[in-house]
Amino acid sequence: MGSSKPLKGFVICCTSIDLKQRTEISTKATKLGAAYRSDFTKDVTHLIAGDFDTPKYKFAAKSRPDIKIMSSEWIPVLYESWVQGEDLDDGLLVDKHFLPTLFKCRVCLTNIGQPERSRIENYVLKHGGTFCPDLTRDVTHLIAGTSSGRKYEYALKWKINVVCVEWLWQSIQRNAVLEPQYFQLDMPAEKIGLGAYVRLDPNTTEAKSYSENQKISKNKEKSGQSLAALAEEADLEPVIMKRGKKRDRSILWEELNNGKFEFSSRSEENSVLLDDFTPETVQPLEENELDTELNIENEAKLFKNLTFYLYEFPNTKVSRLHKCLSDNGGQISEFLSSTIDFVVIPHYFPVDELPIFSFPTVNEWWIERCLYYKKIFGIDEHALAKPFFRPSLVPYFNGLSIHLTGFKGEELSHLKKALTILGAVVHEFLGVQRSILLVNTNEPFSMKTRFKIQHATEWNVRVVGVAWLWNIIQSGKFIDQVSPWAIDKKENQEIKKFTNQNNMVFPTSDRDTRLQNSLAQQPIGHSTPHNSPSLLSVKKRQNNHIRSNTLIQLNSNSKDSTIFPRRSVTVPGDKIDTVWKSSVTKPETPTSPQEHVSYIDPDAQREKHKLYAQLTSNVDAIPPANDLQNQENGLLLITESHRKLRRR
């Protein structure tokens, strides 16, 4: 081995490092002589970071210029060199393993011309960032010259950080990603970057205090004193502590509406701000660790100085709403008064029955949306954030089978509930038995969405943008002509409706309507009544595994029989997505036994030849209905004018 305890006097902390790697780093750092802190305390000298979007990183970048931000490879590489007995330089590989300034930053540019554009691109790549020519959802920062253009508009819509170019230069100067709030485009030039980070002068009192703390730390480590004594003498107050208790804000609404509110989609899109604390919650606390909750000073309450009036909520939900709003700084008023800022109603409350309030009216989904995005939205920014339910729309949505694509997070959850109370059925999977594929046109189409659109078009499922639904909700009138919002470009195709899960109602032609009316008024065929059971009654008693929707009436004593089949057509889709397509054929008056026969079951070849022999041997009458039944499989004989039975 090399020098004994090369990291003695170093105090190391981690952020956004997974549990396995964090354990490795803490173990090896301790063997190298460093002190490892789970919490970000004042004596920390090196922060090992896996992402820039964490509280520890942000605090170090802004308020601790003395701290060196390192990559996760530093300790393992240094440890291997140490155990191999290599001579370690005075820098202890620190300079080689600094975390790149723009680590995990994906930068896009807009409204910046040449040659400045090429210069910025080169600096982004040089300092470890990724340059993105096109704006996508995974871009972290948009550097804009002016507050205009499509990229700028979509960046605001997608909650992407929009900054001026000074953000890049100051981040490079600080060797860390600075917070975008100090580099807004609408700031005066003299205020841009003001307060973004502490510029540490070695001669200042603050710099000396940091130096003294580090000396104290080294002296205490050398003297072998306990961490408890060190904390007492060096005043080790935790700056940012790990999270040891449940996070109330993220589950405030899980019981609202008798269902859990899903936040998992958003955690997939954007890394959770405090994800680096999560693994440590399962670790037992050591005796020398301070068991303190995360406490960030001066965190503003979301609903601070806002007063709410709750209208027509059940008592169980009133208590939850009261706790949710009060925990986030809101006030609840028991009576309507001039101090009210918002009236909150249930999302299912009919608009027509709502009194006229002189205050902005929202539903509880507006509160969920604000909590989800951690910002206050205007009541007109989303159609489902204010009263929208109209019972008059329910008959129009009844029978609609809808599948959603391109939606995530709280918007997906709210959209499902809204369509359900409007009378539609929302399915998790796309199949042929769907009326509409509702697409989120506010987002770029993913490959999965494109795949669904392609198959929906092939299956005659209307592909419609979500703006169609927003227009219905805002106007209060159902719009059956979806062409202005159609993505499938099928102008005249009507929307399919379903009476139940397995039967589809198709638009019928005038000819089919007249024929069905005539069938309802007179007996089928030219037979006389008899006591023999009809094939239809026998069919009803068959096993459930026989999937036949064929209407057959035969008279065993009649020379003429009329058969009206419904042929089953199976199209790839969900497990239950079998389309029963009604096909009614008006028979011609036969002068001889009908010879055009086929079978619903393709495996009934043996029975086919048997029946063919009966037909050819007796030309005076069709065999009785009972003889047309396979005793083993219960197969049904049907007739069709457009098929011919051929001897095999």
UniProtKB/Swiss-Prot annotation:
One Pfam family matching this protein: BRCT
Q: InterPro entries of this UniProt entry?
A: BRCT_dom, BRCT_dom_sf
Q: Boundaries of each BRCT domain copy?
A: 2-92, 96-185, 298-384, 392-486
Name the UniProt record assigns to this protein: S-M checkpoint control protein rad4
Tell me which GO cellular component terms the UniProt record holds. Answer: chromatin; cytosol; DNA replication preinitiation complex; mitotic spindle; mitotic spindle pole body; nucleus; site of double-strand break
- Where does motif Nuclear localization signal map? 242-249, 643-648
Cross-referenced PROSITE patterns: BRCT
Q: Tell me the organism.
A: Schizosaccharomyces pombe (strain 972 / ATCC 24843) (Fission yeast)
SMART domains named in the record: BRCT
Function field: Essential component for DNA replication and also the checkpoint control system which couples S and M phases. May directly or indirectly interact with chromatin proteins to form the complex required for the initiation and/or progression of DNA synthesis. Interacts simultaneously with both 'Thr-187' phosphorylation sites in a crb2 dimer for establishing the DNA checkpoint.
* Annotated localization: Nucleus
